[in-house]
Amino acid sequence: MSKVSAQVLIVNKRGLHARASAKFVGTVAAMQGANVQVTKDRHSAAGGSILGLMMLGAAKGDEITISVEGSDAETQLAELVALIDTGFGED
């Protein structure tokens, strides 16, 4: 089991709001055996918690750190980074 992390810039207009958080949580839920944590300004939330992610208050231009622990952590982290880098598929 390995643990990897990456710093990611929030690029979508509304930041980590309800819909974006739900997409993130849905992606995490599909990751068998992964433990995902998201951190902003020393505050952390479980990657599987919509409310926890929203409480981080990550807005456009903010930087968050995603940490993934699991047997396929690098691939799973890349998938989450891509989701954020593409603005959660929003305009």
Predicted features by range, described:
Residues K3-Q7, E63-T65:
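Intrinsic-disorder/low-complexity, polar/charged segments enriched in Ser/Thr/Lys/Arg/Asp/Glu/Gln
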Residues V8-L9, L16, T75, L80:
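Alpha-helical protein-protein interaction elements
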Residues L9-G52, L56:
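Compact, glycine-rich, soluble single-domain proteins
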Residues M55-D91:
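C-terminal structural segments of small proteins and small subunits
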